[in-house]
Amino acid sequence: MRTIGMSDYTVGEDCFAELPAALAEYGATKVAIIGGKRALAAALPGIEAALEGTDVEVLETRVYGTNSTRANIAKVVNSPACQEADVLIACGGGKALDTVKTAAIELKKIVFTVPTICSNCSAATAIAVVYNDDGSLEGYSYPNRPAHIFINPKIIAEAPAEYFWAGVGDALSKQPEVEYATSTGNLEHTAGLGLALAHTCSEPLFTYGVQGLEDVRQDLSSEAVKQIALDIVVNTGYVSNLTNQNDYYYNSSVAHAFYNATCSIPREGTYLHGEVVSLGVLVLFAYTGDTENLERYAAFNKQMGLPVTLEQVGLTEADIPALCEFAHATNEWKQGNPEPFTDEKFAAAIKAANVYGHQLLA
């Protein structure tokens, strides 16, 4: 037996007007609002205005911390207000949303999400990333998918542009990773549906990405910003839920194995998830020998200011052996779809992508 649920979503600058009706669907009269400090500052005015005059009580507004660690998850789990609430409203980027989603597993709570940045698809997914206190990857948790997503393009447009930029970088991975992971065929219905939807993920990025980033840099809520936000949150999020089930995993592949391995490499600088994943996409195409897409995606990375070389994410070719070693611990490597990964091909792909990137920048 398989049951598939997808998040409802409301998009628009007036999206919070739908919040009371969405809560009423679940008989919810008590909520706790959890998120990052900046995210709460952006989202709370609209949420509070929407709830004014209703029978919904906000039990707590809580800053979750700065990363989706076990310690921050425990703070949500141990909050009396979160324990009492009917619905947890999670506001912020992926780490804030993943913290609340993971806490909700133990609390057995419904989660609504408000992505105040669109740096990844966490607002829609039934998967969450958990980090160790030192920032390295602990692994994944598997919560229920959020019940309802509220996407406000104005809030996203007025957030720091680097998160929008990194979100495009992360979303670039969805279509090629799923296409590669499922390339042996023989998919059952749910996985096949996920693959079909994955085919819709890349083109909006190529079509609207450059304009959207320019608009976000001017704090301008535009059609391009909305289309990118929908692609990152909804398209890739729905794909994640369809390609990640108990009996199969096609949701990520070489690009995320690369990213997750980099989390264990000490280096100077701070690099956003999607920023590094976008370089991992080039590694994926080098790994599969897809020169046409390597060139296309690398050219887009360059146009967007996303990385095309190891040095742009604080690494060098001397780090390749360590990247291979750390990659062994990743879920992507362990799943090994469509066939087991090898150190030799992975190392050669990282080097080949890096060499091509340097040629592109020359």
Residue ranges and their predicted role:
Residues 1-84, 310:
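ATP/NTP phosphate-donor binding region
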Residues 16, 40-44, 70, 95-102, ...:
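Short glycine/serine/threonine-rich phosphate/pyrophosphate-binding segments
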Residues 105-198:
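A glycine/threonine-rich phosphate-anchoring loop and its flanking beta-alpha core
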Residues 188-299:
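Active-site segments that bind and position negatively charged phosphate/pyrophosphate groups
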